[in-house]
Amino acid sequence: MDIQLKRGLLDVCVLAAIKNEDSYGYKIIKDMKPYIELSESTLYTILKRLETANMLLVRTVEHGGRLRKYYHITGLGLKRIEEFKEEWKEMMSIYRFVTKESDENDET
């Protein structure tokens, strides 16, 4: 898979994981695990990129004597999810076209 496409998909997956509630690194990985395998280092790179792009806000909270960063999605982050949904509709249309061509060739 193209690296830029994969990066974009992972960014949107992380945004979707915190869309409904603020979350922290370990919980994001745990919530995403049934759908996609993501290492801690990859996740924190994505979180930093999304924070820099103003799609996430970060707050630090003490939890059990340790500091934990909580991530909150911004309006820009929500907008990115909606843009992705529209882009994906187009991608699915292209996919159907490509596989239709393949299916027709298989039948001949």
Stretches found by the model and what they are:
Residues 2-42:
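N-terminal helix-turn-helix DNA-binding core of bacterial DNA-binding proteins
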Residues 17, 80-81:
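Residues that scaffold the ATP/ADP-binding catalytic core of kinase and kinase-like folds
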Residues 44-49:
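Short, hydrophobic-biased segments on the C-terminal half of alpha helices
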Residues 53-67, 72:
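Beta-hairpin "wing" of winged helix-turn-helix
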Residues 82-108:
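Amphipathic alpha-helical dimerization/coiled-coil segments
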